[in-house]
C-alpha cells in the first residue's frame, strides 16, 4: 500500500520506465499492422512478398513485446499496476481510511484521483 507521498516518490524511478514502455508500445504498432497485411497477402496468393519480411517483422514484434513485458514487470515489482500501455496509466494501491483505493497516475500528469 502506498501513501500519496510514497506514490509520488516512487514516480521518480517509475516515470522513465513508463516512458520506455509507452514508446515500445508505439514502436510495436507499425510492425503489427504490416504483419497483418502480409498474412492477409499470404492467405490470398502471396504475391510480391519477400519471405524474410515476415520473419523480420516477427522478430521486431517479439523484441518490442519483450521490452514492454520487462517494463511492466519492473513496475509491478515496485508495487504499482499498469492499466494502459498506450497512455502510460498506473494505479498505486492505497488506503483511504479503512477503504482500499487506487491512486491513479497518467504519464505527463500528477497523481490525480483515488478510485475503488
Question: Language model features by range: what are they?
Answer:
Residues 30-66:
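Structured domain cores in non-transmembrane regions
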Residues 14-31, 57, 61-64, 68-71, ...:
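Amphipathic alpha-helical coiled-coil segments
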Residues 114-116:
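Conserved small/polar residues in nucleotide/adenosyl-binding loops
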Amino acid at each position: 500500500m502506498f501513501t500519496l507521498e510514497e506514490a509520488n516518490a516512487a514516480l521518480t524511478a517509475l516515470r522513465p520506465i513508463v516512458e520506455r514502455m509507452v514508446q515500445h508500445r508505439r514502436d510495436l504498432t507499425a510492425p503489427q499492422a504490416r504483419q497483418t497485411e502480409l498474412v492477409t497477402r499470404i492467405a490470398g496468393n502471396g504475391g510480391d512478398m519477400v519471405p524474410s519480411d515476415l520473419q523480420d517483422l516477427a522478430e521486431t514484434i517479439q523484441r518490442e513485446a519483450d521490452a514492454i513485458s520487462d517494463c511492466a514487470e519492473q513496475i509491478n515489482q515496485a508495487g504499482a499496476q499498469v492499466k494502459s500501455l498506450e497512455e502510460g496509466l498506473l494505479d498505486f494501491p492505497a488506503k483511504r481510511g479503512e477503504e482500499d483505493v487506487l491512486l491513479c497516475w497518467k504519464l505527463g500528469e500528477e497523481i490525480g484521483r483515488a478510485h475503488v
